[in-house]
Regions:
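Aromatic- and glycine-rich beta-strand/loop motifs that create alpha-glucan
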Residues: 1-22, 238
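Secretory targeting signals
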Residues: 28-64, 96-162, 200-216
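Hydrophobic/aromatic residues in alpha-helical transmembrane segments
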Residues: 64-68, 81, 116, 154-155, ...
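Helix-loop-helix units of permease transmembrane domains in multi-pass membrane transporters
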Residues: 71-103
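Transmembrane helix-loop junction
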Residues: 74, 87, 118, 122, ...
Length: 240
């Protein structure tokens, strides 16, 4: 499995997708830095909260759909899946490896976003920067990122059924817009792509829904998406 992950990273050297996702991750710190330059007053905790909110409820929806479309649809669009399966690698291991690669890639994107935000805060003149606040916010972002990755298993199904980058980007944009409208409503804890940040930041305490219910919905979403993607991927015939 480690060899497979290394191979996936080597493939990224010949693709511009990784650079695109990195630029997407840096767009949030850039916007926050511009806001600081225009005279917007903010604390270190405040700017990290802004970063986590917009990243996990808006930008990551689009970025993660692009990552999934690339990881799970590339072999279909490039017609290389049959060649890969001639190696000692089963469809099950290939699917698990793709999921692991998605989690690792998402972790890298989250770390880049957080690091960029800290740098933006420093360059923007925020004076109350502390290690404890930074580590706590980073922990919340990582928890939110893990939960968001779990909630994205239905997008894996979409990428397997329709391995088209444009379709995935449109789907990501639509879900981002939905998140914007739902995030401030009473239904947010019941939507997996919204509830992940509410759980990690403990903002879910402000809603009538408890953490266990939101987490259960999210895990069920993951289980359903994982099961369907496994069945579809392992049963579908591989075409040249």
């Amino acid at each position: 499995m480690l060899t497979f992950i290394k191979t996936e990273f080597l493939k990224l050297k010949h693709s511009k997708i990784f650079l695109l996702t990195v630029l997407g991750a840096l767009s949030i710190p850039s916007l926050l830095y511009i806001g600081l330059l225009t005279g917007e007053h903010a604390t270190f905790q405040g700017i990290l909260d802004y970063c986590a909110t917009y990243a996990c409820s808006l930008f990551y929806i689009i970025i993660f759909t692009i990552i999934i479309a690339y990881l799970f649809g590339r072999e279909y669009t490039e017609h290389t899946l049959k060649t890969i399966l001639t190696t000692p690698l089963s469809k099950t291991k290939l699917l698990i490896g793709k999921y692991l690669m998605f989690f690792i890639w998402a972790f890298i994107i989250t770390t880049i976003t957080f690091t960029g935000t800290v740098i933006a805060a420093y360059l923007g003149g925020i004076s109350d920067i502390t290690l404890s606040v930074g580590l706590n916010s980073y922990k919340e972002m990582l928890i939110s990122e893990i939960l968001l990755c779990l909630s994205f298993s239905p997008f894996v199904v979409l990428s397997l059924v329709m391995p088209n980058m444009v379709f995935s980007m449109v789907a990501g944009a639509i879900f981002s817009i939905i998140n914007l409208f739902v995030y401030t409503s009473k239904y947010a804890p019941y939507i997996p792509w919204c509830s992940q940040y509410l759980i990690s930041s403990n903002e879910i305490a402000n809603y009538s829904c408890n953490t266990a219910t939101s987490l259960a919905i999210l895990l069920v979403t993951f289980a359903i998406g994982l099961t369907i993607s496994y069945i579809y991927f392992t049963k579908k015939d591989v075409c040249l």
